[in-house]
Amino acid sequence: MVNFASEVDKNNAFDSAHPSRKCKGSLDCNDPDPIFRHKVLVIIHKLAISSWNRIPLTLCNKLHIKRISGALTNAVYYVAPPEGYHAPKLLLRIYGPHVELFINRQVELENLKRLARHNIGPYLIGEFSNGRFEQYMESTTLTCKTIRDPKLSIYVGRRLCELHNFILLHPHEVLEMPAAWKNCLVWLPKAKAKILGRKHSLAITSEFMKTLEEDFNAYYNWFVEWSRDKKDWFGLKMVFSHNDTQYGNLLKIKAKKRSIPLSQKHRTLVPVDFEYAGPNLCAFDLANYFAEWMADYHHPTHNYLMDRSRYPDFNARKLVYHAYVEQSAVINDLLEIEDASLLKTDISDELKNTFEKQIMNLEESVRAISPAANIGWALWGILQCLEEDDEWEDLSVSSQVADRPEKQLVEGSTVPPIGTSSFDYIGYSSEKFDLFYEGCAALGLNGRNRSTFSYA
């Protein structure tokens, strides 16, 4: 398998055998700029990252550091050496607050190494107390607009299929509860406790959370019964799943036009941020990806809203499904493709019928699992809301959120540090809870007077 990262920048590539190092030390993205830069270079020196030891600490103010947009859980930065120094560009990831509620870092780091063996995602370079350095890939992050490109939809379908098939589950993972249910069952009682412990009332109340728990249990029981005779369905396989397939976690790497065969062009699309990755049902990544079409996390005033009109129609979803099942046939040596950006048309009737059955199977599975994806992120939003926000009356009111004081930005940043009030987590959770109920209504379950979600 080709390592496409190395095709981008030969001098910037690390291979899967590159030993990652560990050191003590932590970074605070709210530190004044000179202090932040100095600490970054000190930790790089401690980790003995290739060629960086030649850069003296006195030049820390000459580092190129830029905040990268897209990540909601962590603060992520691009770090490059001063002019005149040749050292690999780095991706710096500073873990966000309260992430221990969601993420087992040891499992995540093991998964990164596991993925690197298949050239999926960046390589881990070094770890420190509250973050890590990764291989930097020259790339463009997908946006709420670019994900609507049909060619990229084909790439997404192919890449998700490869992720689900190349990374084999460990024996103990096969026996685990799918993350779609496991996360909700763990996060729901914690979210209830958080709402109950608030000093000030929110739009999301304790009474709402009690009703939600009952409705989630009813939905879960429905899914168990519905899927009982569908264990062999394509969309219900247990796979190694990304579990956070939002557009900010998909990179389009920059590669020389002739460096990658046409049949493998889809591998210029690189999934990143595997913090939530683990065993899950195949359809979850697809359902979550489609749900993220409704989001615009960089909207200047309403970054928490979900625009239902932006949800992909069936033809757009079918394009992703078709690419997924076609790539599965490629992996199983049932088909060869010449150009990964196109779908094959000259296939046997038998394979065509198989694809049609698998596509409808995926569509039904996506509709069934979509409420789980939405309620999971709704609970995540509540738990992400910082304790310090108790000082504010109601986080669900956008105008109040916009008026709060901002913390200091690091030079060159384009988005605020993790922990600032720029993202309305409670407003986001309210939107996702509504989508949960709308999805339940579409399945014939109690939607609590919400409209039925239209899959068009």
Curated annotation (Swiss-Prot):
Tell me the pathway: Phospholipid metabolism; phosphatidylcholine biosynthesis; phosphocholine from choline: step 1/1
Chief localisation class: cytoplasm
Cell compartments where the protein resides:
Cytoplasm; Nucleus
The biological processes this protein is annotated with in GO are: CDP-choline pathway; phosphatidylcholine biosynthetic process; phosphatidylethanolamine biosynthetic process
Keywords of the record, alphabetical order, are: ATP-binding, Cytoplasm, Kinase, Lipid biosynthesis, Lipid metabolism, Nucleotide-binding, Nucleus, Phospholipid biosynthesis, Phospholipid metabolism, Transferase
Q: Which cofactor does it need?
A: Mg(2+)
What reaction(s) does this enzyme catalyze?
Answer: choline + ATP = phosphocholine + ADP + H(+)
State the Gene Ontology terms under molecular function.
ATP binding; choline kinase activity; ethanolamine kinase activity
Q: Which domain of life is it from?
A: Eukaryota
Report the EC code(s) recorded for this entry: 2.7.1.32
GO terms for CC? cytoplasm; cytosol; nucleus
Which family does this protein fall into? Belongs to the choline/ethanolamine kinase family.
Role, per record: Catalyzes the committed step in the synthesis of phosphatidylcholine by the CDP-choline pathway.
What quaternary structure, including any partners, is listed in this protein's UniProt entry?
Monomer.
Q: What is this protein called?
A: Choline kinase
Which species is this UniProt entry from? Schizosaccharomyces pombe (strain 972 / ATCC 24843)
